[in-house]
């Protein structure tokens, strides 16, 4: 947990819901460790024009052409924020190769779970 902190996923979702409510935002959560499920979800939301997508693609950042293609298509109509809890640029060399960054308006890395809250603040300020 050293790289990722101590907050469990259920608690994180509650905290994000509270933050979104305070900002008068609607948010939808989706999590999967299965590449195809992530791609299917991204493809299913392409109709939500002018929406924001906050994504922590984890290791798929460095490996998934399918996720890259889905985000490329999505980025034509929506804005994407990439969040990584740990600083992927200061970790292993293979993590320095980022397949999705070019489709993201901003990348927030190494800020712990606070990166998700920074993403909501960024959206709110736009």
Label every model-predicted segment.
Residues 16, 41-42, 67:
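Aromatic/hydrophobic pocket-lining residues that form π-stacking "cages" and hydrophobic walls in ligand
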């Amino acid at each position: 947990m050293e790289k990722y902190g101590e907050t469990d996923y259920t608690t994180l979702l509650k905290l994000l819901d509270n933050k979104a409510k305070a900002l008068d935002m609607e948010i939808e959560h989706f999590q999967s460790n299965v590449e195809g499920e992530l791609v299917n979800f991204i493809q299913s939301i392409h109709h939500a024009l002018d929406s924001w997508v906050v994504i922590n693609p984890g290791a798929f950042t460095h490996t998934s052409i399918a996720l890259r293609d889905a985000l490329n298509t999505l980025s034509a109509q929506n804005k994407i924020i990439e969040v990584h809890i740990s600083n992927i640029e200061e970790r292993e060399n293979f993590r320095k190769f980022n397949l999705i960054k070019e489709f993201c308006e901003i990348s927030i890395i190494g800020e712990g779970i606070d990166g998700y809250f920074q993403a909501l603040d960024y959206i709110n300020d736009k």
